[in-house]
Structure formats: C-alpha cells, structure tokens
Amino acid sequence: MTEALELPVVVIMAGLPGTGKSTVARALARRLPAAVLDKDTIRAALFTPERVEYSRAQDDFCQEIMLQTAAYLLGRNSSSYILLDGRTFSRRYQRERVLQFCAQLHTRWAILECVCSEAIALARLEKAVAEQTHPAMNRTPDLYHQIRKSWEPIDNPKLVIDTEGGLDSGVEQATRYLAQIAQQSR
C-alpha cells in the first residue's frame, strides 16, 4: 500500500471575466496555506500604464513570471497551494504550459473553472469598470463576449464552481477537491 502524502498543488483559476475567479482565489488563500499569483497585479507592477498592451505576448510573458514565482515558492516550500489567477486560461496552450511546468517540477496540478450566468458576469464587470476596482482596464463586457466566442473547452479534469451559488459553498467544494489532489498516492 502506498502512503498518501500531501504535496504542493499548482491551481489554474479558469473562467470567463467576471465569473469570480479572483474572489474564489482570495477566499481559498485565507483558508489554505496558499499563495495567489495574479497576472494583472504582476503586469501592473512590471509595466507603467503607457506600456501596458493587453496583448497575447504581454499576457504570456506575465504568465511566465507567474510560473517562475511559483517555482521559487515551491523550492522554498512556502505554500502548499499556488493559485494562478488573473488569466482566463481560455486557450489550451495557456493551460498546457502550466501542466508542462508542473510535469517539469513533478508537482501536482488542479483546474478550478468558475462559472456563472452571463447576466451576473456582465453586471460584475460593469460595476468594476464604473468603480475602477480592477487593475486590468480592458476587463469589460466586450472582452467577456470576445473571450466567450473564442473559448477552447477544458478537456482536463477540473472542478466547476458555480459562483452564483454563494462563495462559502464554492470555496468548501474547492477546498475538498484540492485536498484530494494534494493527498493522492504517488
């Protein structure tokens, strides 16, 4: 019988804009030994407003910084969970890059896909735009529609969290799911 060990898990926070990825990630970080690496915060720290492009190249660059930071944290054993936030992970290549990274470091991974109705997501986005509460200035209803149209389905194992069902129930679901992955036998 193989003993179950609790090992670090890199978590992809996937979902359309406004579906609650950051809210769920922050709530999980309060409950678990976790670090949240937010692409939008990283971009804002690296680039002055006039240098922010919201381009695929800049997003991919920031994702690589997230992964380098994750490798550093994993090497220091400073977090059991690394939550990758601030990117929709709407494209397969984005998710595959994270899975490749995890394979290279022999680290477990999980995908949490946040979902909600279009009306709720758009209302959240409109509120954030009006109040200027999000670091990504391109995070608008138009971006939601653009990403939804080009979304590539997630074929990997995942937990779908309906963020309309209340934060506590979604976080509880995610906590149980992540604990199972962290304790799987090798």
Functional labels for PLM-detected ranges:
Residues 103-125, 161:
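Conserved phosphate-donor/acceptor-positioning beta-strand/loop module used by diverse small-molecule
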